[in-house]
Amino acid sequence: MAKRTWLGDVLKPLNSEYGKVAPGWGTAPLMAVFMGLFLVFLLIILELYNSTLMLEGVNVNWTALGS
């Protein structure tokens, strides 16, 4: 039999819902929305790095960052 520890006793409530599945889609649509927003964020960063997205007054000089 497994030894009981204080950490196991603290974490047990987090595992009390094991095996139970919410009916339907649950929070999957909300997760998809946040994944889409994260994708847009990454695309904006990529375009800034690639200099394909130009912002007025923002000078991106990557060589200056290295020195």
Swiss-Prot record:
<dbReference type="GO" id="GO:0015979">
    <property type="term" value="P:photosynthesis"/>
</dbReference>
<dbReference type="GO" id="GO:0050821">
    <property type="term" value="P:protein stabilization"/>
</dbReference>
<comment type="function">
    <text>One of the components of the core complex of photosystem II (PSII), required for its stability and/or assembly. PSII is a light-driven water:plastoquinone oxidoreductase that uses light energy to abstract electrons from H(2)O, generating O(2) and a proton gradient subsequently used for ATP formation. It consists of a core antenna complex that captures photons, and an electron transfer chain that converts photonic excitation into a charge separation.</text>
</comment>
<protein>
    <recommendedName>
        <fullName>Photosystem II reaction center protein H</fullName>
    </recommendedName>
</protein>
<keyword id="KW-0472">Membrane</keyword>
<dbReference type="GO" id="GO:0009523">
    <property type="term" value="C:photosystem II"/>
</dbReference>
<keyword id="KW-0602">Photosynthesis</keyword>
<comment type="similarity">
    <text>Belongs to the PsbH family.</text>
</comment>
<keyword id="KW-0604">Photosystem II</keyword>
<keyword id="KW-0793">Thylakoid</keyword>
<keyword id="KW-0812">Transmembrane</keyword>
<dbReference type="Pfam" id="PF00737">
    <property type="entry name" value="PsbH"/>
</dbReference>
<keyword id="KW-1133">Transmembrane helix</keyword>
<dbReference type="GO" id="GO:0042301">
    <property type="term" value="F:phosphate ion binding"/>
</dbReference>
<dbReference type="InterPro" id="IPR001056">
    <property type="entry name" value="PSII_PsbH"/>
</dbReference>
<dbReference type="InterPro" id="IPR036863">
    <property type="entry name" value="PSII_PsbH_sf"/>
</dbReference>
<comment type="subunit">
    <text>PSII is composed of 1 copy each of membrane proteins PsbA, PsbB, PsbC, PsbD, PsbE, PsbF, PsbH, PsbI, PsbJ, PsbK, PsbL, PsbM, PsbT, PsbX, PsbY, PsbZ, Psb30/Ycf12, peripheral proteins PsbO, CyanoQ (PsbQ), PsbU, PsbV and a large number of cofactors. It forms dimeric complexes.</text>
</comment>
<dbReference type="GO" id="GO:0031676">
    <property type="term" value="C:plasma membrane-derived thylakoid membrane"/>
</dbReference>
<feature type="transmembrane region" description="Helical">
    <location>
        <begin position="26"/>
        <end position="46"/>
    </location>
</feature>
